[in-house]
Each structure stands twice: as C-alpha cells, then as structure tokens.
C-alpha cells in the first residue's frame, strides 16, 4: 500500500472557481447535464459542483461499475474466485463496445479476472453477459440495495440471469466512487485490483477526461465512461500526486448534440476533455485519505 497524502495547510478555496469553469464549458457544449463533483481534501466528500444530481438517467456503460460492485462483493465474501472460469460461447457475444466480438472463433475459457478487466478497461459488453453467469441481475440489484443505493439498478431479464444495464444518478455514482476510492466499498485487495484496471490507459478510453494529459497525469485518473444514443457520461476518481484520492467526478449528460458521433469530436466529449484538464490544474493540494495506487508505477507500465 502506498503512503497517503497529507493535507497542505492554507489550501485556497477553489470550488467556486471550478464551478464557474464547469458552467462555462458545459454551456458551450450543449446538452442537458447532471453532475456532481466532490473534493476529498478534507477526508470527506465536499461538493464543489452540483447540477441536477438526482436526475435518474440511463447509465450506459457507467453501470458496469454497479456490476463490478456486486461481483467483487461476492469475491470478498468468498462465493466467487477471480480464477473461476466460463466459456466464451458464440451466442453470448454482444455488439457494441469491447474486443471479444472481433474474434474469428470462440470457445475460450475466460477467468472472472479476465472478464472484470475487459468490462472495465475496454467496456466489453460481452463480458457483462458472461459475468451474469456469476452474478445475476437480481443479485446486482440486491447488492446495490444493501449498500443503500436506491436509484442505481440494472434491469433483469425475466427468467434469465442476464440483464440490461439500467439507470443511476450522478449523486449515487459519486457516492459509489467515493466508497471505492476510500476503501470502504470493497476489501483492500479488491479495491487495488479494480483501481489498477481503471487507471490503466495504454489500452482503454482516453477521448474524454484524460485526453489532454501526459502519461503521468493520466495515471492519476481512474475513469469509466458511457455512451448510448444521446447520452455521454464520464465519471471517475482523480488522485493527488502521491496517489491518494482527491476528487470524485460524475459527469452525466443527455440530449447531447451530434448524437451519432461517438468519437472525440462530439461536443460533450470535448467538454469532458476540457473539464479533466481543468480539474487537474485547479486541484493541486494533497489528500489525507489512504492511497491504493502508485501513479508513477502505473505511468511506467507497472502495478
């Protein structure tokens, strides 16, 4: 475990300044935004930007964090092992994001660890289907309910373990990410495993929050994006220079302009990139929270 950062005395109050940046950036981008950004510099989440944070919205691939939470809770309870395997059957392959759909043949034996990595790192939709063999939609929702999340839900398919990804809110997503970042959602081992995946940028999504950053800077962000129809979301954790969690951001948007453009030039995605740079440049103090990652090792290709 890496050392935690220590709060620097006399940290300036930057919340209003960042809120003003957020309002200006999102106004230019267009769309309808639902957002919560929290500063963890005091050891607890303090909102610095909040806009329509309780709006229930289709979470798209951000909901894979909910699936991860249920899965890793079962791992922590000893009911699932990361080394457990399942077969990549052709009829389980899903369209959309991911890598398994590009294979020319199937039948692979895949571990839970492999599926967790592909689900979070390349947002693989097939991985979600295969993980439903280990945690059903009803189990995911039961875990979320037990943890106090009332609006974050997947949609179970009748008579099946599979599910659609469902809905969430910016507030509940922010809370889930804070619990993950602070080590209160999962065990130490599971927290480290998940954050290793979410901070890795050699493969994965960098069009949004992490776009305008060096490799060292990108290693200080654990992110999960989602896109579906007119929705564009980017959520995650920003760590301080020592690897302690400093900020949690939950940017959700619907009614995005240029909705058929899923690339980096979509106006909302461009706004995400600008907001990511603004977060990094604005919040430079250290966090008193425990660190579960080492950004320097991540940036150099290690763990």
Language-model segment annotations:
Residues 5, 10-25, 29, 134, ...:
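Structured C-terminal helix/loop/strand segments within mature extracytoplasmic catalytic/sensor domains
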Residues 69-77, 133, 175-182, 280-281:
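Short glycine/serine- and small hydrophobic-enriched flexible loop segments
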Residues 40, 82-100, 135-136, 197, ...:
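Acidic helix-start/capping segments at beta-turn-to-alpha-helix junctions
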Residues 30-57:
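Short, conserved catalytic-motif segment at the N-terminal edge
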Residues 38-41, 90-91, 119-123, 134, ...:
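Active-site-proximal beta-strand/loop segments in catalytic clefts of secreted hydrolases
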Residues 32-33, 128-185:
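Mid-domain, small-residue-enriched loop/turn segments at the edges of structured enzyme/sensor domains
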Residues 57-86, 249:
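Active-site SXXK
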Residues 92-129, 137:
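Conserved catalytic neighborhood of penicillin-recognizing serine enzymes
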């Amino acid at each position: 475990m890496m050392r935690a950062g220590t709060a620097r005395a006399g940290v300036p109050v930057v919340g209003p300044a960042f809120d003003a940046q957020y309002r200006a950036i999102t106004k230019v981008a267009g769309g309808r935004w639902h957002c919560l950004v929290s500063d963890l510099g005091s050891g607890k989440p303090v909102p610095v930007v909040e806009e329509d944070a309780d709006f229930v919205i289709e979470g798209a691939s951000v909901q894979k964090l909910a699936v991860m939470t249920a899965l890793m809770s079962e791992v922590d309870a000893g009911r699932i092992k990361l080394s457990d395997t399942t077969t990549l059957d052709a009829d389980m392959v899903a369209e959309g994001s991911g890598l398994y759909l590009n294979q020319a043949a199937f039948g692979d034996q895949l571990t839970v660890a492999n599926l967790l990595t592909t689900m979070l790192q390349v947002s693989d939709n097939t991985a979600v289907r295969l993980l439903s063999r280990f945690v059903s939609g009803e189990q995911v929702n039961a875990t979320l309910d037990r943890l106090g999340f009332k609006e974050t839900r997947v949609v179970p398919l009748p008579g099946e373990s599979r599910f659609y990804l469902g809905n969430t809110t910016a507030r509940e997503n922010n809370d889930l990410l804070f619990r993950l970042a602070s080590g209160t959602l999962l065990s130490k081992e599971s927290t480290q495993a998940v954050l290793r995946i979410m901070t890795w940028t050699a493969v994965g999504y960098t069009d949004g929050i992490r776009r305008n950053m060096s490799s060292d800077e990108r290693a200080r962000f654990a992110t999960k994006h989602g896109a579906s129809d007119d929705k564009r979301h980017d959520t995650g954790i920003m760590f301080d220079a020592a690897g302690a969690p400093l900020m949690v951001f939950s940017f959700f948007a619907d009614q995005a302009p240029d909705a058929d453009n899923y690339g980096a030039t979509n106006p909302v995605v461009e706004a995400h990139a600008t907001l990511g740079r603004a977060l990094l440049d604005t919040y430079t103090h250290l966090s008193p929270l425990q660190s579960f990652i080492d950004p320097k090792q991540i940036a150099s290709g290690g763990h």
